[in-house]
Amino acid sequence: MDILCEENTSLSSTTNSLMQLNEDTRLYSNDFNSGEANTSDAFNWTVESENRTNLSCEGCLSPSCLSLLHLQEKNWSALLTAVVIILTIAGNILVIMAVSLEKKLQNATNYFLMSLAIADMLLGFLVMPVSMLTILYGYRWPLPSKLCAVWIYLDVLFSTASIMHLCAISLDRYVAIQNPIHHSRFNSRTKAFLKIIAVWTISVGISMPIPVFGLQDDSKVFKEGSCLLADDNFVLIGSFVSFFIPLTIMVITYFLTIKSLQKEATLCVSDLGTRAKLASFSFLPQSSLSSEKLFQRSIHRDPGSYTGRRTMQSISNEQKACKVLGIVFFLFVVMWCPFFITNIMAVICKESCNEDVIGALLNVFVWIGYLSSAVNPLVYTLFNKTYRSAFSRYIQCQYKENKKPLQLILVNTIPALAYKSSQLQMGQKKNSKQDAKTTDNDCSMVALGKQHSEDASKDNSDGVNEKVSCV
C-alpha cells in the first residue's frame, strides 16, 4: 500500500482517501465487467487514482516522513554494509583470540596488532551499525540529536586509533632494526602495553573536541538533517593530524626499515663469505697436515658461523614480517586516502564544487575506509601460518592446539635420535682414525728427520777423523 505523506494530515482524512480510492476501484471494475467502460473512462480513472496514491510530500520536510519513504524501498547498499559489519566483528575477534591464546604470537608487534583489532572490532560494533541505519533513513539522523556528537566522536576515535597503531608499529620495528641490543633489553610486555596506552591516549586527545563542542552547538555536527562534521576548521586540522601526518611518518619509517634490512642482509652474506675463505686458507706448510686440519676443524666449529646463520634467519623473518605489514599499510592507505582527500576538497572548493556529488562520494568512500577494518584479518590468514592454523581451530571451537600423545612422540623421536647418535659415533670414529693416521705420519716424518740429522752428523765426524789421520 502506498503512503499518503502530507504533513499535519489527520488519520480521518487518510482513511477517507483510502475509502474513496476503494470506491472508485469498485465502480471501475463494475463498469469494466458490464462492458460500458471505454478508453477515456479508463484513462480518467488512472489519472485520478495516481493523483491519490502518489507519494505527495508537498510541505513534508520532517525526518519521520522522509524516513518512512526510504524504508519502503529496497536498499542493497545497506545489505552490503551489513556484510562488512559481520566480517569486521568476526575477523577481529579471531585476531584478539589468536594473540591472547597462542604463545608464538605474543610479542610486541602482535600486541599492537591485537590493539588494532580491538579498535576495528569496536568500530564494527558501535559505529558501522549506526552508519547503516542512516543509510536506511536516507542519510538523515534517526536518533536523538545528542547522540550525533557521540557517534562522530567514536568514529573519529577508532579511525584515528587505527592509523596511530600502524604508525607505532612502523616506528617500533625501525627502532628494533637500528638498535637491536637496546630494543631487546628494554622491550618487554609492559613496555609494549605502555606504548599501546600512549597510542590510545593520543587518539582520544585528537577526537575529544568533537563531543566538547558538538554537544554545546548542534550546528557543528548537523548539516541539513544529516549527522556530519560541519566545522571546516576541524575538518582540515583533524584530517592532517589524525591521518596525513601519521601516514607520512609510517611510510618514511617503513621504507627506512626495508633499506636497513637489505643492508644488514648484504653485510651478513659478505661476513659469511669471509668466514668461508678463512676456513679454506692454509697458514702452514704442506708437510704439517695435522695442524692444518685442526685449524680447519676449529674454524668449522667456531660458534660465530652458527651466529651468522642465526642472524640470516632473523633477517629473513624480519623481511617476511615487513612484507605482511607492508600489505596492511598499503591497503589502509589505499582505502582511507579517497575519503580524506575528498573531505579536504569539500572544504577548499566549497563554492565551486557540487555539494551533492561531494556528499555522495563521501558516503561511498567512508565505507571503503571501514572495509579496511575487515580486510586485516584476511591478510593475516593468507600470509601467516600461525594465524591461519589458529583461526581454523577457533572456527571449529578448538581453542587449544592438539598435542601428540607421549607414546607417539617417543615412537617418532627415539629412532631419529638413535640414528643421529649412530651417525655421530661413526663420524667420531672416522675423525679419530684420521687423527691417528696424521699423528703417525707426523711421527714418522719426525723420526726420519732425526735419523737424517744423525746420519749427517756421523758423516761429518767421519770426515773430520779422516782429515786428522791424513795429517
Swiss-Prot record:
Biased composition (Basic and acidic residues): 451-465
Residues binding serotonin: D155, N343
Residue positions with a glycan: N8, N38, N44, N51, N54
Position of the signal peptide: none
Chief subcellular location: membrane
Disordered: annotated segments: 450-471
Cytoplasmic face of the membrane: 98-111, 172-191, 259-322, 383-471
Similarity comment: family membership: Belongs to the G-protein coupled receptor 1 family.
Name the record gives this protein: 5-hydroxytryptamine receptor 2A
Organism whose genome encodes this protein: Macaca mulatta (Rhesus macaque)
